[in-house]
Amino acid sequence: MATVGMNDVKNGMKILVNNEPAVITETEYVKPGKGQAFTRMKYRFIKSGRVVEMTMKATDDVEVADVVDTDMRYLYSDGEYWHFMDPETFEQVQTDKAGMGGADKWLKGEEDCIVTLWNGTPIWVQPPNFVELKITETDPGVRGDTSGGGGKPATLETGAVVRVPLFVNQDEIIKVDTRSGEYSARVK
């Protein structure tokens, strides 16, 4: 495996920590007036989402993870596995709920996603930034009922629940930001 020195470590780089892939979220190079320089970094394990902070000497090395981000199209779910296809090679891969990373609540079929593969196996799925989904259940908005912030919960066709404005009704299609899980707009 390839290794890089602490001087070459950057945010967004994918590394191996205890044989598990992680992505670096923050790095800070510190050169104290007295003593040896060191790098303080935060990284998030891709599979579990756990965030860890670590301090390493400037002379230490980290192992680069052999992970690949691939554009793939979500096809379907058979209840236990979610199936994806590479639109160029038509190669198909499947992942379980752990590999979905919470993206399953935003996907209904035929969406383009970024799938992170580690040793050929999907370990993380990043859905599109915005998805258009139909509201299957929500309470009718009562005029003047804005004391609680002017929102109400709505269940979408995939089972996800988001807060929507009072003017949005059942059977309407809305645009949702998958990064925050918030309502973005009503689709006409």
Curated annotation (Swiss-Prot):
GO molecular function: translation elongation factor activity
HAMAP family for this protein: EF_P
Post-translational modification: May be beta-lysylated on the epsilon-amino group of Lys-34 by the combined action of EpmA and EpmB, and then hydroxylated on the C5 position of the same residue by EpmC (if this protein is present). Lysylation is critical for the stimulatory effect of EF-P on peptide-bond formation. The lysylation moiety may extend toward the peptidyltransferase center and stabilize the terminal 3-CCA end of the tRNA. Hydroxylation of the C5 position on Lys-34 may allow additional potential stabilizing hydrogen-bond interactions with the P-tRNA.
Subcellular location: Cytoplasm
Residues of the signal peptide: none
Family that this chain belongs to: Belongs to the elongation factor P family.
Name used for this protein in its record: Elongation factor P
Entries under PROSITE patterns matching the protein: EFP
Domain of life: Bacteria
UniProt keyword annotation of RNA-binding present: no
Entries under SMART domains matching the protein: EFP (SM01185), Elong-fact-P_C (SM00841)
Alphabetical UniProt keywords: Cytoplasm, Elongation factor, Hydroxylation, Protein biosynthesis
Source organism per UniProt: Xanthomonas euvesicatoria pv. vesicatoria (strain 85-10)
SUPFAM superfamilies assigned: Nucleic acid-binding proteins, Translation proteins SH3-like domain
One family name in Pfam for this protein: EFP
BP terms from Gene Ontology: peptide biosynthetic process
